Amino acid sequence: MINTHNGVKEKGIKRIDIDDYPAIKAHLDSFYQQLEKRQDKGDTPYNLRNCAYIEDFSKQKIVYPNMTKFMPFLLDKKNFMTNQKCFIMTGEKLAYLTAFFNSNIFKICYRDNFPDLQGGTRELSKIFFEQVKIPDVEDSIDIDFDILVDDVQKGNDNISLKLEKVLILALELEQYEEYILNYDINLK
């Protein structure tokens, strides 16, 4: 990915000077006419438009798609960039939030907050997330979620059930445990 950002003037972050990268400039020069016509260019045709949140890509964050059937949320601890339209969340208790958003509890309670598009796909835009009320947990519990979410993201499927049970306990939903654990999103 070529990130020739325009900098963040308010924070003193300078724009990328394409002349510092002659091989990339030579490649982009073959598209110069198209670059020059762009409405969303930065200070030069080589630079992207201003992005006030560019530093958020270098933070731990939750990454999730704009539209999806399965509502997957990934905790990114390695500062990845995406090449598709995705959303990101930064802030506190990201491991807990990742666990919560991937849980049956979230799907049962909030799936209908997100518009149903064709074929059962849901739109996960920010405006719909703003309507979601997320139960808070103690900071000490977030550490447990951090370990469990890491294991799930490494492909340890056995941990998914444990993670769901930890959420049930943390949110005091034991009386609904059987329903939550047996919930099948495909039947809805």
Please state what every model-predicted region is:
Residues M1-I141:
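Polybasic, glycine- and aromatic-enriched phosphate-binding surface used to engage nucleic acids
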Residues A23, F31, D136-K188:
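Non-catalytic DNA-recognition/assembly elements of restriction-modification systems
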